[in-house]
């Protein structure tokens, strides 16, 4: 039986999978697998690749896969394909995160427009310029999150702002040895999960930085990093969902990638300050300290970058074809 005219050919399938693989993930773990076919793409979780020592490990896998899922949608929209998205479509297969089925021609123009920033987006752990992100841009980022069923809440008032900064510092100091050892193994592997040029400099602990920048390698002497003072008052926001569970984590991941691509288009970079979200008790404190009423999924540090790091390396993608429906 011949495929319809809107079916994906093999080069298109390969391009979509490659784009999806560029999505952000915890420690660049890329905990996903993609199955492609003429009729669409499936996103599968691959928890074997994810850090396992934190309380947030399972949530992080679904968040990362959600970011990849939005990138699949943007890539297919760029190819002018309309799609139907089913999240967690098989009750008996929790690792099947989403099935994206091509239904015809006519891609989502907003998602297609965001695709142009897929290759430019970076997780930026370097210092940002001190000027704040304009309120109008933050409103656009909030709208991007809401489009995917999440809420981006800016931390712009005291004492909530300082409380969350304090929680970030507390979580960094209280990290379990197993967490640090797992991360060190990943950072010193061949190849490293996050190369030195993507780690950013060691934060200068002289009171000049705002404490939101996460040093991923505090116990490692890695040549070439250097030290730097970071912005004294980092722009912080919390990405939240009304519910908490795999479907909400996938939604948060889609919202994250959508707002990050929107931010990239406005010259804004981001890194993540999720330290307190990796501990169940501190995660609850983030929610209450920020005077929020949803479930915090990500803490973002945003700003205008002084340095644009290279793209973090991606592992080769094996994307077997799945049978036609």
PLM segments and residue spans:
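Acidic, surface-exposed loops and disordered segments
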Residues: 1-325
């Amino acid at each position: 039986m011949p495929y319809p005219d809107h079916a994906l050919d093999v080069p298109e399938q390969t391009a979509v999978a490659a784009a999806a693989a560029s999505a952000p993930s915890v420690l660049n773990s890329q905990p996903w697998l993609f199955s492609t076919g003429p009729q669409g793409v499936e996103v599968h979780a691959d928890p074997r690749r994810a850090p396992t020592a934190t309380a947030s490990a399972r949530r992080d896998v679904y968040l990362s896969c959600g970011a990849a899922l939005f990138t699949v949608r943007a890539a297919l929209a760029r190819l002018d394909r309309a799609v139907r998205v089913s999240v967690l479509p098989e009750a008996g297969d929790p690792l099947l995160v989403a099935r994206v089925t091509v239904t015809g021609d006519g891609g989502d123009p907003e998602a297609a427009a965001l695709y142009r920033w897929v290759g430019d987006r970076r997780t930026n752990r370097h210092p940002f310029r001190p000027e704040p992100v304009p309120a109008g841009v933050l409103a656009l980022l909030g709208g991007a999150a809401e489009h995917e069923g999440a809420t981006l809440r800016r931390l712009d008032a005291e004492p909530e702002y300082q409380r969350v900064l304090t929680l970030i510092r507390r979580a960094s100091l209280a990290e379990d040895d197993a967490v640090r050892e797992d991360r060190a193994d990943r950072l010193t592997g061949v190849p490293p999960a996050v190369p030195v040029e993507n780690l950013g400099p060691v934060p200068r602990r002289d009171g000049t930085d705002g404490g939101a920048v996460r040093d991923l390698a505090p116990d490692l002497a890695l040549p070439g990093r250097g030290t730097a003072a970071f912005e004294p008052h980092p722009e912080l926001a919390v990405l939240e969902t009304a519910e908490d569970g795999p479907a909400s984590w996938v939604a948060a991941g889609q919202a994250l990638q959508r707002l990050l691509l929107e931010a990239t288009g406005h010259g804004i970079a981001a890194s993540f300050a999720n330290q307190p979200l990796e501990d169940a008790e501190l995660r609850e404190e983030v929610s209450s300290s920020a005077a929020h009423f949803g479930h915090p999924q990500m803490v973002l540090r945003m700003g205008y970058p002084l340095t644009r790091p290279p793209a973090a390396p991606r592992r080769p993608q094996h994307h077997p074809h799945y049978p036609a429906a």
